[in-house]
């Protein structure tokens, strides 16, 4: 059984030319060969700086599952820290939970 939830928020930058999308995702895997991954940052940025923020939390309950952190969006920072079991910060736009 795999439980995945994500909360996204969008805000307009001060310059009004770009928007910043930040997302937080949490995944809990309760079976072998399951994948729990975090959220994915969006494109655009704060004050036009092109910063994508992503926060991810992966919790491995079995020891045999894979947990992945989050990654930044387009032109953003890919700082992904996985939970228990290791992490992979390059899941944005990849096969990690379809995000």
Curated annotation (Swiss-Prot):
It comes from the Eukaryota. Residues 1-29 are annotated as: Disordered. Disulfide bonds: none annotated. InterPro entries: HssA/B-like_chaperone, HssA/B-related. Pfam families: Coiled. One of its GO terms (biological process) is sorocarp development. Belongs to the hssA/B family. This is HssA/B-like protein 42. It comes from Dictyostelium discoideum. The gene is hssl42.
């Amino acid at each position: 059984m795999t439980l995945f939830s994500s909360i996204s928020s969008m805000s307009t930058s001060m310059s009004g030319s770009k928007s910043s999308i930040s997302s937080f995702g949490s995944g809990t895997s309760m079976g072998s060969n399951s994948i729990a991954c975090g959220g994915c940052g969006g494109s655009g940025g704060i004050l036009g700086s092109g910063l994508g923020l992503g926060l991810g939390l992966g919790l491995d309950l079995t020891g045999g599952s894979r947990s992945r952190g989050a990654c930044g969006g387009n032109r953003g920072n890919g700082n992904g820290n996985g939970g228990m079991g290791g992490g992979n910060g390059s899941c944005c736009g990849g096969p990690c939970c379809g995000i």
